[in-house]
Swiss-Prot record:
Function of the protein: Receptor for the siderophore ferripyoverdine.
Subcellular location: Cell outer membrane
Keyword match Phosphoprotein: no
Membrane association type: Multi-pass membrane protein
Protein encoded by which gene: fpvA
Protein's name in the database: Ferripyoverdine receptor
Lineage of source species: Bacteria, Pseudomonadati, Pseudomonadota, Gammaproteobacteria, Pseudomonadales
Pfam families: Plug, STN, TonB_dep_Rec_b-barrel
Domain TBDR beta-barrel, residue spans: 276-815
Keyword terms, alphabetized: Cell outer membrane, Ion transport, Iron, Iron transport, Membrane, Receptor, Signal, TonB box, Transmembrane, Transmembrane beta strand, Transport
InterPro entries according to UniProt: Plug_dom, Plug_dom_sf, Secretin/TonB_short_N, TonB-dep_rcpt-like, TonB-dep_rcpt_b-brl, TonB_rcpt_b-brl_sf, TonB_rcpt_CS, TonB_sidphr_rcpt
Chief place of localization: membrane
């Protein structure tokens, strides 16, 4: 039916929404627009296809597809998410389904509908368990088609939009991962603006943000035990098949994590069961015999839908551009949701992940110097590892959550998590200053085995409260985590021939040693207890003030001397001021601390004081198109104390009776700025891009963390065509980083040498074609121009190359 007065339904909805928001819409005008079409809303069936998304954008799309005027106040639907509707429905049925679980009601007036949301204190709307789950972790990104999130809760445990959050945060959504084939956490981090991925070797990567290694991981908001980067033990191997999105909160995050890194926290949000039956099968094949398969099935398990489940399995078998290296990974995931009553939901689940490599490189992929101190020049395919070398790692997790919706908008949640991270690593690789003049070389062979068992508990309450005539929000909670790391190391080998005669043509063929008895034992127990609180005070309609803090007790006991921090207080202060309906300015302050690893000892053999620092941040954020597009610009400073640095003066002495190698704690300061944009630029056009600049200097003014580039740029985008090409989606992106360098000690020549990685671009492309409604085919091309670059220089005087050009073809069937 044509729109009266020559206005499209979307234009009418926009104009009437503005009038409605300002309360100046005359009743006669509303009647004049709606009377010619009275009764239409309830009368005709319409073909709908609206995926879950921000409620404001869903209402606009509903108005367009139904040719109906939709009136609503933007502030009432902000932070809410629609349900999906698909198929032939009467508009009144469709809008009811669209609004399910939002707390919104609809009033029909001919061909116009008015959406309203009751005040929380007076609402009798049934807040179902699905809504609670979604809101407490933020909005689900799966099936949204978006590169930006709706709401997030990583920063303060309060559920906020990116614009309302007084810290920088980047979210890599499910759509972004699917478009660019981001199948593991390493891939996701490489696409995350402001993050540097440094490869220690074939199976260990480290992530950096704002000049600091990231050791803070969360799973559904539950902090995991801070990982030991040297052993990795699973965190950096997470397969993305089981996750809805990855949230990266930049800067100090002590409010919810307690002890941890100053750089960032990575929060992996698991996929949840759906109310409708759905699933997919995906198969892929790519460069270097890279094969991957994935199965995902979800839906209700009872007729009423009060029990829902989801199962995911993925398997990958891949070789590499590196000689004699291959890796098999497998992941299995299951989750169940039980609606115990209309206000209470129980969630239980488990996941199982294995990483089984062969031919693992160790401490880089090739040595930088030969025995004469000359720089080695080897091909990208060179692999220093023996064929039997394997850094096998695994993760086992079981978890349970209980959520209850109390009266007046309050929600309580109890979360339990049990995790086992393990490794079994018989390792052999050419390490040191090789080859000799006769082209011979020696390998270093050692074995590491171990397992960390951890248990985490988090309990919190959140909800609104009244103070001085205004409504505010509060979160109060407590958490506890316990972990036990047991390990063995083997390196005292006897009668082992570790020599190869041909370094240049090394193919990994060498005998495996008899490991004998352990040379070292690890038996560390870590306990962290904490209580936290955050309040969001609505000081005025435009100003929100955040006040909070955490009290931490942290203790490590074991074979090394006990490390303890008791009653440590971590403050959190933030403010957000709305300049208008689009832009907000913000400022925040918080800090964090992390006890030093046991080998960071001073010249008196005393463990260094905990690394600690304060994070200051100011910025401006923008929100466009009802939250479908978000922007941010931030300036930050991090003031660090007790950064571990080599004590060069002490270590240069010929004899050191107290300790052979000493460190000292120094002060350092990071200054930088970030700009980011994510979301929908226009219908069908998604983007995520960011630029980061930072400089880290110690208290003498010298630059530190120079291997992490000062400048980084990331841009990824996709476009779904309309009209005759509406089955085609194309996309691409690029990552650029400025020059970085590392000082490496040349032992044969007894001097330090500077190794640099010049600035470089990496370009990726993707395309997807929707063959049928259920079947699609995709291709991803990474490093299109086959750029040669290093992902690490200097780790044990070695280096590692990044991946050359590679392709991946995949096909997906949805059901």
């Amino acid at each position: 039916m044509p729109a009266p007065h020559g206005l499209s339904p979307l234009s009418k909805a926009f104009l009437m929404r503005r009038a409605f928001q300002r309360r100046i819409l005359p009743h006669s005008l509303a009647m004049a627009l709606s009377l010619p079409l009275a009764g239409y809303v309830q009368a005709q069936e319409v073909e709908f296809d609206i995926p879950p998304q921000a409620l404001g954008s869903a209402l606009q799309e509903f108005g367009r597809q139904a040719d109906i005027q939709v009136l609503y106040r933007p502030e009432e639907v902000r932070n809410k998410r629609s349900s999906a509707i698909k198929g032939k429905l009467e508009p009144n049925q469709a809008i009811t389904e669209l609004l399910r679980g939002t707390g919104a009601s609809v009033d029909f007036q001919g061909n116009a509908i008015t959406i309203s949301v009751a005040e929380a204190a007076d609402s009798s709307v049934d807040l179902g368990a699905t809504m609670i789950t979604s809101n407490q972790l933020g909005t689900i990104t799966e099936d949204s088609g978006s590169y930006t999130p709706g709401t997030i809760a990583t920063a303060t445990r309060l559920v906020l939009t990116p614009r309302e959050t007084p810290q920088s945060i980047t979210v890599v959504t499910r759509q972004n991962m699917d478009d660019f084939g981001l199948n593991n956490i390493d891939d996701v981090m490489r696409h995350t603006p402001g993050i540097t991925v440094s490869a220690y070797d074939t199976d260990r990567n480290n992530y950096y943000a704002r000049g600091f290694s990231i050791n803070n991981f969360q799973y559904d908001g539950i902090p995991s035990t801070a990982r030991n980067v040297g052993y990795s033990a699973g965190n950096t191997l997470s397969d993305m098949a089981i996750y809805d999105r990855v949230e990266v909160l930049k800067g100090a995050t002590g409010l919810l994590t307690g002890a941890g890194s100053l750089g960032a926290t990575i929060n992996l949000i698991r996929k949840k069961p759906t109310h409708e039956f759905k699933g997919h099968v995906e198969l892929g094949a790519g460069s270097w015999d890279n094969y991957r398969s994935e199965l995902d099935v979800s839906g209700p398990l009872t007729e009423s839908g009060n029990v829902r489940g989801r199962a995911v399995a993925a398997y990958q078998d891949k070789h590499s551009f590196m000689d004699h290296y291959e890796r098999k990974t497998s992941v299995y995931y299951g989750i169940l949701e039980f609606d115990l009553n209309p206000d209470t939901m129980l969630t239980v689940g488990a996941d199982y992940q294995d990483n089984d490599p062969k031919g693992s490189g160790w401490s880089g992929s090739f040595p930088l110097f030969d025995s004469q101190g000359n720089r080695n020049d080897v091909s990208r395919s060179f692999n220093n590892g023996a064929k039997w070398s394997s850094w096998e790692q695994y993760t086992r997790t079981v978890f349970a959550n209980l959520e209850h919706n109390f009266a007046n908008g309050w929600v309580g949640k109890v979360q339990l998590d049990h995790k086992i991270n393990g490794y079994h690593a018989p390792l052999g690789a050419i390490m040191g200053d090789w080859p000799a003049p006769d082209n011979s070389a020696k390998i270093v062979a050692q074995k590491y085995t171990g397992e960390t068992k951890s248990n985490s508990l988090d309990i919190y309450l959140t909800g609104p409260f009244q103070f001085l005539g205004r409504e505010h929000e509060l979160v109060v909670g407590t958490s506890a985590s316990f972990s036990h790391w047991e390990g063995k190391s083997y390196w005292n080998l006897r009668n082992y021939d570790n020599t190869t005669d041909d370094f240049i043509n090394w193919d990994g063929d060498i005998g495996k040693p008899d490991w004998g008895t352990p040379s070292q034992y690890i038996d560390d127990k870590t306990r962290q207890l904490g209580s936290y609180m955050t309040a969001r005070f609505n000081v005025t309609d435009d100003l929100n003030l955040f006040l909070g803090g955490r009290v931490v007790d942290y203790r490590v006991t074991g074979l090394n001397p006990t490390i303890r921090e008791s009653g440590r207080f971590i403050p959190y202060v933030g403010a957000v001021y709305d300049l208008n309906d689009t832009y907000s300015v913000y400022a925040s302050y918080t800090d964090i601390f992390m006890p030093q690893d046991s080998w960071y000892r001073d010249s008196s053999n005393k463990l260094l004081e905990p690394d600690e620092g304060q994070n200051y941040e100011i910025g401006i954020k923008g929100e466009y198109l009802d939250g479908r597009l978000n922007t941010s610009l931030a300036y930050f400073e991090i003031h660090e104390e007790n950064r571990a640095e080599e004590d060069a003066l002490y270590n240069s002495k010929p004899t050191n009776p107290a300790i052979t190698y000493a460190y000292k704690g120094i002060k350092a300061k990071t200054k930088g700025y970030e700009a980011e944009i994510s979301g929908e630029l226009a219908p069908g056009w998604q983007v995520q891009a960011g630029y980061t600049h930072k400089i880290i200097r110690d208290d003498s003014g010298k630059k530190v963390s120079t291997w992490e580039p000062q400048d980084q740029l990331s841009l990824y985008t996709s476009y779904k065509f309309k009209g005759a090409l509406d089955k085609l989606t194309v996309g691409g992106g690029a990552r650029w980083q400025g020059k970085s360098w590392q000082m490496v000690y040349n032992n044969p020549r007894s001097r330090w040498e500077k190794f640099s990685q010049e600035d470089y671009w990496l370009v990726d492309l993707m395309a997807r074609y929707q063959i049928t409604d259920k079947l699609s085919a995709s291709v991803n091309v990474n490093n299109v121009f086959d750029k040669t670059y290093y992902t690490n220089i200097g780790f044990y005087t070695s280096a590692s190359y990044g991946d050359p050009r590679n392709l991946m073809f995949s096909t997906r069937w949805d059901f």
